[in-house]
C-alpha cells in the first residue's frame, strides 16, 4: 500500500455522498424537500439524490446502506438552520449544542431513523453542551 507522501499532489478527495437505505422513497423525499429544504437532484423509482448547497445525500429503497446511519455535515449557520427546521416541523433530537471538538451541532432524525448532525464552528469562549448519544 503506498504511503501518503508518495501520492501525486493533483489527487484530491472532495467530499463523500452517503447512500441511505429507506423504506419509502416518496416519504423520504417529501421530508427532505418539504421539511429540510433540500431539492431533488435526480430520481428513479428506487433510487434518488437530494442536494442543499454542497451537501448531497442519496437514498436507496431496501438496498444499499443500513438503517440508523449517522451523518455529520458542516453548515455555515447552525442556529439559523435550527430555527428554520424547528418552524418547518423537523424531528429535532437536539437543538444547538456546543461540543469539545469545537463544534456547535444540531441533531435531526429522518423518517428512516437516520440521525443527521449538522455543525458549525464553535465561537470562542462558548460553554460545552451535553451528549445525548
Regions found by a protein language model. Give the residues of each.
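Conserved short beta-strand elements that form part of the metal-binding/catalytic scaffold
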Residues: 2, 39-70, 115-120
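N-terminal beta-strand motif that seeds the catalytic metal site of vicinal oxygen chelate
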Residues: 1-29, 56, 69-71, 120-133
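Conserved acetyl-CoA-binding loop of GNAT-fold acetyltransferases
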Residues: 35-40, 89-91
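Short, basic/aromatic recognition patches
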Residues: 93-97
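Vicinal oxygen chelate
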Residues: 15-23, 49-51, 62-88, 104-109
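C-terminal structural segments of small proteins and small subunits
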Residues: 101-102, 119-121
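Conserved active-site tyrosine of GNAT-family acetyltransferases
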Residues: 28-33, 85, 110-113
Amino acid at each position: 500500500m503506498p504511503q501518503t507522501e508518495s501520492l501525486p499532489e493533483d489527487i484530491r478527495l472532495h467530499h463523500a455522498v452517503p447512500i441511505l437505505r429507506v423504506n419509502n422513497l416518496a416519504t423520504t423525499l417529501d421530508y427532505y424537500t418539504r421539511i429540510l429544504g433540500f431539492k431533488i437532484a435526480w430520481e428513479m423509482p428506487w433510487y434518488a439524490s437530494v442536494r442543499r448547497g454542497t451537501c448531497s445525500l442519496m437514498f436507496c429503497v431496501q438496498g444499499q446502506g443500513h438503517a440508523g446511519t449517522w451523518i455529520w455535515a458542516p453548515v455555515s449557520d447552525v442556529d439559523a438552520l435550527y430555527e428554520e427546521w424547528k418552524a418547518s416541523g423537523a424531528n429535532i433530537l437536539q437543538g444547538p449544542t456546543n461540543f469539545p471538538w469545537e463544534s456547535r451541532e444540531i441533531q435531526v432524525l429522518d423518517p428512516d431513523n437516520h440521525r443527521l448532525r449538522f455543525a458549525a464552528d464553535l465561537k470562542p469562549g462558548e460553554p460545552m453542551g451535553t451528549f445525548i448519544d
